[in-house]
Amino acid sequence: PTMIFGDLCDHNISKFIRMFDKLPIMPEIDHGAGPIQPVNARDLGQAYYKAATHGSLPQLEYICWGERPVTVHELCALIGKYLGKKTRFVSFPMGFGVFLAKVLKAVTFGKKDYVEKMLRLGEDRSFSHEAASRDFGYVPDSFNEGLKREVEEYMKHGK
């Protein structure tokens, strides 16, 4: 999985939560249309346990993603809702975002390189976990509930 979440040390969704809490306006690329499918660390732990204790499995490699795909925009809107903040978005085209990332990289002599991160915002990062569900009963928890727990943890401990 490319985006694991579940606590304030995840370096993924926790960064979005902090940004949302600090910024009055949230920038997004191409209206936040890029699909992602974050997986909760708890779900991965259960998947590893189920796979390890299942006995023989028909394949050696499984994709274990979160419950469902969400767009980056939906993710950010949910974070705003759970933080109790009015959500304001400003959308930029992908090309402009990549241009700004390249300028930042140039003026910092390569110390700040966000070009790849910018490009990833437009990638489809959603995949099926059908084989894991079929072969060893992988059923991820609700994405919304997992996100809500992480925002509540932030509000309690992370500010």
Residue spans for each PLM region:
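A secondary-structure boundary/capping signal
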Residues: 1, 65-66, 123
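Conserved beta-loop-beta element that borders a ligand/cofactor-binding pocket
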Residues: 1-7
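Conserved loop-to-helix N-cap of the C-terminal "lid" that shapes the substrate pocket in Rossmann-like
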Residues: 7-10, 32, 37-45, 61, ...
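Low-complexity, charge- and small-residue-enriched intrinsically disordered regions
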Residues: 13, 25-41, 103-126
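A conserved pocket-lining segment of Rossmann-fold NAD(P)-dependent short-chain dehydrogenase/reductase
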Residues: 18-39, 47-51, 55-56, 63
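Mid/C-terminal beta-alpha module of Rossmann-like enzyme folds, strongest
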Residues: 50-113, 129, 135-159
